[in-house]
């Protein structure tokens, strides 16, 4: 069953394709515009590709008549469409990910094996993988090739790993009782190649000692629930009137819960 067949509820694929044309503003009524006709043909072809009909043939036909009823030149426009079989996604492969796990990358996909091929969702998946910022850019466009005689497709996403972590550190020395101070910062947005993030920040010196540790998981237990845990300890010393020191220790958590009735990517954040 496919939602674009003759038995499906709602408008047919052809009706929706024609609707794309009618929504576009064009030249004055009754005036033929070759550029807009070509654009309309491209949109019809795109509509078929997004429903899996990548082998469909859309041939624009322009028939010129010498004169119409009002003695004006007239053209008749139509498309000759051969739909053929829709393409089903047979297999999806990931290549070149020497460090990042397949599971991490596949979570970015809007298509899965068994789906009817959809060009827009393929493009969205490709962009989502690039937005991870774990791979060199520009990211090659996915390879598609026939999988069998029925015209089903195998899709391959190719990536090339790049360095993602960072380490920052520094030190300073001051006189008049200030002493030695410094900072260390470590951040890895692709911890263990699992798309999890870990960061550590430490500022230290005679009068201050701040420590912060954060861990983020975008898919807790392989679910669509994300989470962040942070722990911190802050110590400040005062040398005015023997005020002593102030120490604060704490932690925070945040959960991102999916809201599927709004959209697949929408989440609701809950913090404590």
Predicted regions and their residues:
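Interaction-mediating elements
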Residues: 1-132, 136-154, 159, 164, ...
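Gram-negative/organellar outer-membrane beta-barrel architecture
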Residues: 10-19, 57, 99, 115-272
